[in-house]
């Protein structure tokens, strides 16, 4: 077994990429086309939920135009991901051939960053999803890679994680309610009432205690609080239970002695645990119940402040799952929500129709930069580099993502390094001639 960092030291670092590690026995260009084919086929499978999920959820409203749009989105994601991944590995060959050896940052990090530039052609929706997922993985990886007092607290203190998740929950739900942030989050906020609704609430507040109580409105309108709460619980169970069932079916291996598909599925279902269902249910229950109670007992507070407190309290549902990845994901999404608010403020302050101040060109330029694509490229460079060099800092979900978008190529490279001794790698290199083309 060879420590991955030994790749950058003699004698391995001076071997040609067609001799060992990368693509022994075949040329660089052939390696690129092989990767492009394998990544395209693997991507059709890995990204199939992008096609199947809309067809299932929108089966009643699906028409020809919607289907073609969904299919186009799916195929574009598969193609550009395959191109980016294949080009990244081909850039490893280019850097090796130009520099004459494998170097630390020109072997994995820089080739990946360059190859990921094909993601500029990816649909914005998919790009934002990839940027969020990889940013969460990088944040968690950095916490594991650089252990100190602060990172240990963030990784191992449940109370700290819960408090920060609650803060992030309040920020995200607040900006989703204002329609500033429109992407994924675990909970949908109740809608913000119109000015006419607030006027009605103010008038109702002056009604005497013996008046008809049905006239009073809560944050959710005219429906009863019990129905508002029950609807949230139903949505939580509808979202969480399928995820837990899928997790039970996909996680782990089939127990030994299971004969037949039905027996294997039943054995898998026995491992069912309501992890996500419990999280969604508790999140919805705490968030919606606290919203009603705050409106009832602290109605003198502003509606936005009430909602911020309800969103904060709802985040305490983190205690049910207690996973670092949930905390890191919430931090990334909260930053995205704050950034979206910043962009809106910049647009409003520089609008010549509503503002008398001169436009701030620096802020306008900063707002228009596609940071999601830039950050994603850097994220992928970090993740691929550490997949080979510091495998333990990446979580299982990240490893699966990298295997999926590279058709297991990153895993093959790592296994070829770690599962062979130094002598075996040298012997493999000597047994293969240098092939620079095909």
Describe the predicted segments one by one.
Residues 1-77, 81, 85, 90, ...:
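Intrinsically disordered, low-complexity N-proximal targeting/linker segments that flank membranes
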Residues 80-86, 103-111, 285, 302-310:
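Short hydrophobic alpha-helical membrane-embedded segments
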Residues 89-100, 115-118, 293:
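Helix-loop-helix transmembrane hairpins and adjacent membrane-interface loops
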Residues 96, 143-144, 291-295, 339:
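Alpha-helical tandem repeat RNA-binding modules
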Residues 96, 116-123, 314-322:
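Hydrophobic alpha-helical transmembrane segments
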Residues 97-106, 150-155, 299-304:
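A cross-kingdom feature marking solvent-exposed beta-strand/loop segments within repeated
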Residues 284-313, 331-336:
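Active/binding-pocket-proximal capping segment
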């Amino acid at each position: 077994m060879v420590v991955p960092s030994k790749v950058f030291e003699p004698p391995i670092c001076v071997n040609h990429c067609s001799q060992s590690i990368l693509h022994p026995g075949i040329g660089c260009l052939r390696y690129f086309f092989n990767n492009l084919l394998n990544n395209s086929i693997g991507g059709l499978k890995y990204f199939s939920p992008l096609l199947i999920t809309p067809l299932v959820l929108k089966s009643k409203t699906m028409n020809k135009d919607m289907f073609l749009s969904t299919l186009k989105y799916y195929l574009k994601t598969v193609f550009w991901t395959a191109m980016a991944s294949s080009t990244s590995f081909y850039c490893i060959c280019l850097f090796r051939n130009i520099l004459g050896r494998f170097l630390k940052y020109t072997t994995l990090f820089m080739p990946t960053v360059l190859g990921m530039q094909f993601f500029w052609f990816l649909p914005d929706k998919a790009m934002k999803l990839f940027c969020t997922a990889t940013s969460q993985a990088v944040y968690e990886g950095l916490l594991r890679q650089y252990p100190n007092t602060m990172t240990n607290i963030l990784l191992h203190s449940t109370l700290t994680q819960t408090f920060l998740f609650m803060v992030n929950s309040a920020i995200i739900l607040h900006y989703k309610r204002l329609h500033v942030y429109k992407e994924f989050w675990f909970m949908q906020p109740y809608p913000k009432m119109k000015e006419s609704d607030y006027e009605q609430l103010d008038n109702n507040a002056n009604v005497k205690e013996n008046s008809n109580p049905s006239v009073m409105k809560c944050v959710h309108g005219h429906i009863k609080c019990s129905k508002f709460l029950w609807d949230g619980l139903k949505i939580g169970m509808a979202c969480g239970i399928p995820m837990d069932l899928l997790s039970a079916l996909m996680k782990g291996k089939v127990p030994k002695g299971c004969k037949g598909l039905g027996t294997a599925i039943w054995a898998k279902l026995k491992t069912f645990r309501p992890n996500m269902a419990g999280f969604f249910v508790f999140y919805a229950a705490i968030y919606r119940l606290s919203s009603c109670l705050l409106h009832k007992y602290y109605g003198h507070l502003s509606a936005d402040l009430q909602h911020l407190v309800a969103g904060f309290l709802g985040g305490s549902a983190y205690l049910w799952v207690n996973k670092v990845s949930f905390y890191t994901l919430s931090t990334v999404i909260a930053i995205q929500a704050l950034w979206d608010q910043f962009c809106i403020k910049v647009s409003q302050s520089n609008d010549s129709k509503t503002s008398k101040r001169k436009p701030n060109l620096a802020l306008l330029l900063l707002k228009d930069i596609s940071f999601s694509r830039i950050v994603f490229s850097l994220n992928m460079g970090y993740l691929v580099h550490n997949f080979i060099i510091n495998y333990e800092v990446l979580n299982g979900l990240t490893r699966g993502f990298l295997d999926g978008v590279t058709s297991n190529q990153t895993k093959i490279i790592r296994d070829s390094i770690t599962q062979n001794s130094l002598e075996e790698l040298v012997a493999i290199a000597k047994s293969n001639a240098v092939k620079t083309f095909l």
